[in-house]
């Protein structure tokens, strides 16, 4: 894994000469955030050594290098999911590459189902913690000490400092945000009524099929993380809504202008 990461980093450095400060992972229906970037390079995943290929609708499949208010960023237009058949090391490989490209902070976005009755479709939720119910773990196996320690402290997976900054940015820009706990399941099926009830009983506010593995690997390498969920459907155990992927994409796209603004202004404020 170490050699593959270094090979990929060297390729991207030679091609872009970039040392980004922020890495951004764009979830389902949120890919147009790249319109807010002064783009210098767009590299399809298919051209990048050792990179997997995104197979899910709503995930374009390219690394975008550019600047926001003069700050260097790299954005993933499309992520990789465990349910696509990739192992966890492959799902999280881009996070390791971005870390060794130079990023200091990882911003992760996703579309998720809400179980908190105070949520509604279209809400933006800042993730304050997560529950990991994936059947595999990205750090399972022999530890590579050059990446990070064998046992990772996960008491603060999402930086409290970054959450406070994001809330302040949201307030300044009149963007309504909530916070909550995200629960990660493998997918690709949407949750049953009983599973939504389980999510709620376990103490989560929303549920999705990504983010958790990426944040675990980011914390393994001591990266600060900010997580942003868009609520695209509601899982009320008394009145479950029928949902499909097209509806999820549509709901995410409707909320996207505010998500874009929040992330753009958050990064700009750090200059």
Model-derived segments and their meaning:
Residues 1-154:
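Metabolite-binding pocket within alpha/beta catalytic cores that recognizes anionic/polar moieties
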Residues 153-200:
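Active-site rim beta-loop-alpha module in soluble metabolic enzymes
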Residues 209-247:
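Zn-dependent metallopeptidase/amidohydrolase metal-coordination segment
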Residues 99-102, 200, 219:
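Non-catalytic positions within long, well-ordered alpha-helices that form the structural scaffold/packing
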Residues 235-271:
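His/Asp/Glu-rich mid-to-C-terminal helical/loop segments that flank catalytic regions of hydrolases
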Residues 104-105, 205, 224:
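Short acidic/polar active-site loop segments enriched in Thr and Asp
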Residues 11, 15, 161, 165-176, ...:
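Generic non-transmembrane alpha-helical segments
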């Amino acid at each position: 894994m170490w050699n593959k990461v270094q090979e990929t980093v060297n390729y991207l450095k030679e091609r872009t000469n970039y040392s980004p400060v922020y890495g951004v992972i764009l979830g389902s229906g949120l890919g147009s955030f790249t319109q807010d970037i002064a783009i210098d390079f767009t590299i399809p995943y298919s051209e990048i050594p050792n990179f997997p290929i995104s197979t899910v609708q709503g995930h374009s499949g390219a690394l975008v290098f550019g600047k926001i208010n003069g700050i260097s960023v790299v954005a993933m237009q499309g992520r990789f999911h465990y349910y696509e058949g990739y192992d966890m090391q492959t799902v999280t490989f881009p996070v390791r590459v971005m870390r060794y490209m130079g990023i200091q902070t990882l911003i992760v976005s996703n579309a998720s189902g809400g179980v908190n009755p105070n949520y509604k479709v279209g809400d933006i939720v800042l993730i304050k913690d997560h529950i990991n119910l994936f059947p595999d773990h990205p750090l399972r196996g022999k530890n590579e000490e050059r990446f990070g320690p064998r046992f990772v402290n996960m008491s603060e997976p999402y930086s409290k400092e970054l959450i406070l900054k994001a809330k302040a940015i949201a307030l300044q820009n009149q963007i309504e945000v909530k916070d909550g706990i995200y629960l990660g399941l493998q997918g690709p099926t949407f949750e049953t009524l009983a599973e939504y009830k389980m999510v709620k009983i376990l103490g989560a506010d929303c549920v999705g099929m990504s983010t958790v593995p990426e944040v675990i690997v980011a914390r393994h390498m001591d990266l600060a993380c900010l997580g942003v969920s868009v609520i695209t459907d509601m899982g009320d155990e008394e009145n479950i809504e029928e949902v499909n992927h097209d509806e999820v994409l549509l709901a995410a796209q409707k909320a996207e202008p505010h998500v874009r603004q929040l992330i753009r202004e958050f990064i700009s404020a750090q200059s």
